[in-house]
Amino acid sequence: MGSSDYSTVGRSAGLMTILTIVSRVTGFIRTWAMAAAIGMSLLSSSYQVANNLPNMLYELVMGGMLVTAFLPVYMGVRREQGREASNEYVGNLLGILLLVLGGISLLGTVFAPGFIWTQSFLSGDGGSMDTAAFMFRFFAIQILFYGLGSVFSGVLNAHRDYFWSTFAPVLNNVIVIASFMGFAPVSAQFGERAGIILIAAGTTLGVFVQMACQIPALGKHGVHPHIHIDFKDPALRQTIALGIPTLLATVCMFVSTSITNAAALVVQPETGPSVIAYARLWYTLPYALIAASLSTALYTELSHDAQEKDYDSVRTGISRGVAQMLFFLIPFALYLIVFARPLNMIYCAGKFDESGVALVSEFLIYLALSLPLYGVVVLMQKSFSALLDMKPYSRYCLYSAIGQAGSVLLFGVVLGFVCRRLRDLGRLLAVVAASSPAWSSGQIYPAWRVLWPFARWPGCCRRRRRHVGA
């Protein structure tokens, strides 16, 4: 696969940024179509909860492990044992994903109400999420699609082929847009339940296409995996060893997100999760355009240099990545804070009114404070993964999740009950967002203290090297 070349990071990030712009444009059209079709309502919240849950479950079970462990292990196997061995590793991983994630998808389809309860347990009204449970029966299979797509993207990224993994969401968005555009006429002619089935089936079809469109590109790089299951594969054991600490971080994320969704339903009944979802579209835009592209391209080079024990290059890559992340994301965060309301006026169509715009804008103002820190935290995660040591990162995620969940419950839910008569629920909901910057920053300093000496002082490098090889 060649030696690392940090000069290609900017070029690769540029390609991904262009494709991400196209993806985000279609993503905005998708969100606008959703806002026009179902507005900010109980149906909208049900859709958001049910649609986010498959990705959360995939991340909880396998996602964090695959994202952090697959690429460096795959690159190591291909370099040391050749193409055939790396193909066997990929085939083994795909076989295990089909077994594990396929089983979880089946459980989600059968026991959908129980899965949805994990996101609404504080609301006390289980019947309000019946529609979410119905849609989740369609969405559960997405858990498997996300897992397979992650492996395909990881293989392509390892070969510095970023086109299809970045362009695939565009196809997903186009299909979902068509589903939402058809919601109103289908509901008018056949009833609302038929319209719900349309958007549920269309959303799942979009995720399937996002996964499947990457398969043809694998052959161009000589990747022809034979799907099988071998739990004794040394590469699989290395993947699990590296991924287990990541599992703790993923559990923390799942718990904190579940508490946030449940608290949102308490603080802002029926529409709380919708407020979060609409605000996060703007919040994730600069991250997707700049930070995600930069960290993805940088991750490949960091993994290669870590495999070669070239810690000076690792140091250079991490330092440059942090500087670029802050340089781009701080101005974007200020922009979101200043122009929150004008930006969210784009939603004001169909069933989405100005009161909804005000709620989403207030939430976005507080949430935007964490944007630069969020980008750096993601880069820290990529750096620890490239160095094959996720234990420190997982520990910091645990501390952060405890603090954030405590803040949400104390200031969002408890204060929400105390101040219920004031009807200032929008400001209380913003407290949920305000907790994110504080606890994100709590991850960065200790993580940086670990990463910086790793590349700076030779003695520490030797100590870390022994730890990684253990």
Predicted features along the sequence, with ranges:
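Membrane-embedded alpha-helical bundles of multi-pass transporters/translocases
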Residues: 1-470
